Amino acid sequence: MESPKTFMRKLPITPGYCGFIPWLSCQESSSEDRMNPCVKAFQERTQRYKEDQQGLNCSVANTPPLKPICSEDTVLWVLHEYAKKYHPLTLECKNEKKPLQEPPIPGWAGYLPRARVTEFGYATRYTIMAKKCYKDFLDLVEQAKRAQLKPYEQTYDVRAAQPLSPSSKILQLQGLSPAFPEFSGPGQTPPSEDPQAPRPCGCAQWSSQSCSRNVYGEPPSLAKAFAES
């Protein structure tokens, strides 16, 4: 039994056919006079495409195979090591520190240092741009580490503040004499003074000033009002 022939394979087209005609929509008019040239041009172009494919297959089959530069085991080992180090689904150790120039995950669009302030990303692939940006960033970090840092006082011309010596009034209030600055600690007296001797009120040491408090430490106005009452 013979196979049925494909419809519309031979020209001319059956009169009254109103189905799809290739390239007919690109013509000036869609009349029946344009149907036969469109189908004929489509068949010729399809035949040329088939001949080109056959020629390409013949040339590929006749081309001698390339010589491998390494064995298949080496290629598999390299792929295994790469997947072991950089595959995003593998569990990594927390103590393992990956290099900064690690190849980025395909599709990752995160932050890249020095990417927007330099021209490393112009007319280059993303991996090349990432490698250049990371390298420039590492160079800047190493340069900053090697730079000699000046101290704060030398950078801003600031001199260290000298400790102030206690004034004579503070020493007098503490019962010390300015002539013996080494006995400035609390509870210490100069060697010339007797620790058992009674000490006068601190207000009496200033002859030019009058004492404004009585024995009980109250102002004179309050003490006078209390005595009159």
Curated annotation (Swiss-Prot):
Annotated GO CC locations: axonemal A tubule inner sheath; nucleus; sperm flagellum
**UniProt key word Cytoplasm:** yes
Domain of life the protein comes from: Eukaryota
Location in the cell reads: Cytoplasm, Cytoskeleton, Flagellum axoneme; Cytoplasm; Nucleus
Q: In which tissues is it expressed?
A: Expressed in testis (at protein level).
Where is the stretch described as Disordered? 181-201
Q: Which UniProt keywords apply?
A: Cell projection, Cilium, Cytoplasm, Cytoskeleton, Flagellum, Nucleus
Q: Which GO terms describe its biological process?
A: flagellated sperm motility
Per the entry, what this protein does is: Microtubule inner protein (MIP) part of the dynein-decorated doublet microtubules (DMTs) in flagellum axoneme. May serve to reinforce and thus stabilize the microtubule structure in the sperm flagella.
Q: How does it assemble?
A: Microtubule inner protein component of sperm flagellar doublet microtubules.
Q: What is this protein called?
A: Sperm-associated microtubule inner protein 5
Please give the organism.
Answer: Mus musculus (Mouse)
Organism phylogeny: Eukaryota, Metazoa, Chordata, Craniata, Vertebrata
